[in-house]
Amino acid sequence: MPRKSAAELEAECLRLLAMDPHTRGIKRVEIIRMHPKGTGPNWTYGALDPMPTRAGVAIAQTLIASVYGRWALAD
């Protein structure tokens, strides 16, 4: 799986979030390294700033999940 830095992953998440009216106000996505057993994603997000509405959070989770399977967090 291709690797990206935390800044690159955040930029990709923000690019996708900017396309939806419920999430376009988000300016920061905190990227957190995980240490999975097996082949799961090695990162997740921890915070959205500013926090969107409940509907926006659900949409953001879906959009960010689409990034999990495409890139791993670089060492």
Residue ranges and their predicted role:
Residues 18, 33-75:
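Detector for the mature cores of small, proteolytically processed
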Residues 1-28:
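N-terminal acidic leader/helix
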